[in-house]
């Protein structure tokens, strides 16, 4: 992907922009447009790490899987990403990626798998949940909320989060499942990088369940991509239907399982997270 440095570039492209600095090394800076509570939105960090691998001169194929481990908050300012090719096979290629900030050390690590997809037999037993078209649903107001939330349009079909209350009430828990149409704002054609970011754009499941703003942070996220470049291009800048749920909250950690569907009913990506919470 070409470096996005022009002022006319989409905010997302500016946020993930990298400059090469020697073999397998890139330099970047955090973006105010995707700021979260204590650092950049985790999705844009994941996309930036993936961008480094995609820009490597030895990269083959397209991404099919990526695991990101968030080791520490990324501070405002510059960072360095180091990318290392671990092994290249006939059809797959494996990478390790590391983001560091000077004396603060490593803030995130990742492994990524790329593949040369081929035409094969296909079967799609999983079916997209029924949901009204996004245009028929109200957009969630995000003005005044975290900057990263203002970078997306959210239209909930199920599981709209309740207004946060100051103190959680365990005798009034909400559902953990949500169905939400998600798109970049302003609109931007979907690609592997923005898909990686959107895979982390679900609100914390504990916000839905306890109806309160509780400190959380993703510790590790794995995203699997089920489409190739042509299939992503067919989606354009349209909404994706995000389906997210959890299995357990226990002793400070919870999981999140998620799916992203195109409007046409194609499963585009799935993701799994382990999330820290303080309660």
Protein language model annotation of sequence segments:
Residues 1-279:
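Terminal targeting signals and extreme-terminal segments of soluble enzymes
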